[in-house]
Amino acid sequence: MLKNNINDSKNLDRTFSIAPMLDWTDRHYRYFARLMSANALLYTEMVTTGAILHGRGDYLTYNQEEHPLALQLGGSNPVELARCAKLAAERGYDEVNLNVGCPSDRVQNGRFGACLMAEPELVAECVDAMKQVVDIPVTVKTRIGIDEQDSYEFLTHFIDTVMAKGCGEFIIHARKAWLQGLSPKENREIPPLDYDRVYQLKRDYPALNISINGGITSLEQAQTHLQHLDGVMVGREAYQNPYMLAQVDQVLCGSTKAVMSREAVIEAMLPYIEAHLQVGGRLNHITRHMIGLFQGLPGARAWRRYLSENAHKNGAGIEVVKLAYQSVQTDLVAQ
């Protein structure tokens, strides 16, 4: 009845995905991203098992429009992870992903994230526990190594061990993580990228679905990686320059639909914003994710400034978004 074969994860199109990013990839950002790309696989922020099982809020809320959508879990207790995976499947998530890549001290203190690379048998046990109770893909996001344990053999031992319990999809951040001495931000920038190691992994494990993450800033770079791998996961660039998503379907996925204009994206966001405001939400909960929409264009500064100065004010409504767009048009005319 349950899907426990190694190819489960190939049921989803993994050509392009947006990385789970704490404080960034919340449900408002994901709705915004989905407007621009129908094909991108979206990920939640990492949610800990403790938050889901014992927290007061509902950490699994999302909009139906966000599909396909994966829940990223942080944890290392197989029983708790299985409970959370089952809840995710019952709520309609399309995938559960285990975080084995975050190097922050807080995450390490909870015994999850990148430090779990040193315990591949435990990761395998966690994957197995989740796969036993769900029929959606269970995947792992990890690094190419940790600290001085950064040999190719270390990575393949990890892959072999976790794969043996049925994990058929790995998202590899092509940097190792330093567990001490670097901040999470520094761990995304200082350890050198080694794309060739991830390419080699795909050559050695052709049956696995392998996506690459780390330092990817354009769809042209994504196309290059896709010559070697099954998928590309983009993080910061997809947030800071979100309009790159508007061409994902056409450039990477073969869509013949017209590329959505920035103006059309803004117009499509207005009903969503209004609905959020009507239930007591604040405008800046949503517009903070839209700040980079005009990245690289004349008017980008005017857009950012107007939203930053006005969206947080009490009573701010959609007129703020409209006026911000007018300021962009004024700058464009001035050019």
Curated annotation (Swiss-Prot):
It is an enzyme of class 1 (oxidoreductase). It catalyses: 5,6-dihydrouridine(20) in tRNA + NADP(+) = uridine(20) in tRNA + NADPH + H(+); 5,6-dihydrouridine(20) in tRNA + NAD(+) = uridine(20) in tRNA + NADH + H(+); 5,6-dihydrouridine(20a) in tRNA + NADP(+) = uridine(20a) in tRNA + NADPH + H(+); 5,6-dihydrouridine(20a) in tRNA + NAD(+) = uridine(20a) in tRNA + NADH + H(+). Its EC number is 1.3.1.-, 1.3.1.91. The active site is at 102 (proton donor). CDD domains: DUS_like_FMN. Gene3D superfamilies: 1.20.120.1460, Aldolase class I. The keyword Magnesium does not apply. Its cofactor is FMN. Transmembrane segments: none annotated. One of its GO terms (molecular function) is FMN binding. InterPro entries: Aldolase_TIM, DUS-like_FMN-bd, DUS_fam, DusA, tRNA_hU_synthase_CS. Catalyzes the synthesis of 5,6-dihydrouridine (D), a modified base found in the D-loop of most tRNAs, via the reduction of the C5-C6 double bond in target uridines. Specifically modifies U20 and U20a in tRNAs. Belongs to the Dus family. DusA subfamily. This is tRNA-dihydrouridine(20/20a) synthase.
